[in-house]
Amino acid sequence: FNRERLQLVFNETAADLRSIGVECAALVQTNTPLPASVVSVLYDCLYDFATVANAASDAVLMLFVQQDERRVQLRAMLDSSDAESERMATTFDELRASLEKHRVEYSIEADSSSASLVAYVPFPTKGGK
């Protein structure tokens, strides 16, 4: 996935969210094509934050993807007047399990009105491990 294709994926999701009342914007800054395995993890993060944003009132979701030589960083920030705590907790538990399965370094912080994620998705090593 080159930068333009990944930006398109994130922009389409952002547009879908805006159409249902969630303010959303995404910025992708990559300089080389990304492996499908990396994009899959990024999309899981995007989708999980979109799910929480959809259930929240007055939600604002910002997404930023940046690449270095070893990995891709995704930062997601969600603000809301009343994020649905139970749904948020369940969704983030599932996201944590997925990130750990893929050996992704991450930090998720959440309270009743906001949530943030910083995830570092490594490039696959030769041999796919």
Listing of model-derived features with the role each one plays in the protein:
Residues T125-K129:
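C-terminal end segment of the histidine kinase catalytic
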Residues A26, R70-D82, A119:
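Conserved DxG motif in ATP/Mg2+-binding regions
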Residues Y47, T51-N54, E84-V118:
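ATP phosphate-binding glycine-rich loop and adjacent ATP-lid/helix-beta elements
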